[in-house]
Curated annotation (Swiss-Prot):
It comes from Solibacter usitatus (strain Ellin6076). GO terms for cellular component: cytosol. InterPro entries: DUF520, UPF0234-like_C, UPF0234_N, YajQ-like_sf. Gene3D superfamilies: 3.30.70.860, YajQ-like, domain 2 (3.30.70.990). Nucleotide-binding protein. This is Nucleotide-binding protein Acid_3194. Keywords: Nucleotide-binding.
């Protein structure tokens, strides 16, 4: 019977994203090279999206760079962002939508479970909705599982939480 367990989650702290968006918008408004570019950053918390708008692609890339630097300073993982296409918009502007990924998708969770099973570690991994629970007999095995997963790239940001020992 496994006595120890931990959860693998992928979460983005929305208050930190909100603060980063506000800081980025303030910098965009103050930067000389973006003065008349009609650049805008809008956070839609209910949809987990950030909408970016600017006068052309070059200035949009500058806005993205500013936003990314503010997100990094606030410890928001950039792996949790999914960038949409750059779309021409009304008034000769361009838009881009960034989706904030919350939770682990089923395909990624299956990859994580498969990686743990292929490693021959004595742990049981189970998919629990939008997170993966890993259980094992001793803490050392769980630490090895965490090290193995940190060394692998699944294209998502993973946090290891809810570490339980008996």
């Amino acid at each position: 019977m496994p006595d120890n367990s931990f959860d693998i989650v992928s979460k983005i702290e929305m208050p930190e994203v909100h603060n980063a968006v506000q800081q980025a918008m303030k910098e965009v408004q103050q930067r000389f090279d973006l003065k008349d570019s009609h650049s805008n950053i809008e956070l839609k918390e209910k949809d987990n999206k950030i909408l970016l708008q600017s006068s052309d692609e070059y200035k949009l890339k500058n806005v993205i760079d500013i936003l990314q630097s503010k997100l990094v300073k606030r410890n928001v993982p950039l792996k949790g962002l999914a960038y949409g296409e750059i779309i021409p918009s009304a008034g000769s502007t361009v838009k881009q939508e960034i989706t904030l990924q919350q939770g682990i998708a089923i395909e990624k969770a299956r990859d994580i479970v498969k990686k743990l099973k292929d490693s021959k570690l004595k742990v049981q991994a189970s998919i629990q909705g939008d997170f993966v629970r890993v259980a094992g007999k001793d803490r050392d095995t769980l630490q090895s599982a965490i090290a193995l997963l940190r060394g692998s790239d699944f294209g998502i940001d993973m946090q290891f939480t809810n570490y339980r020992t008996n």
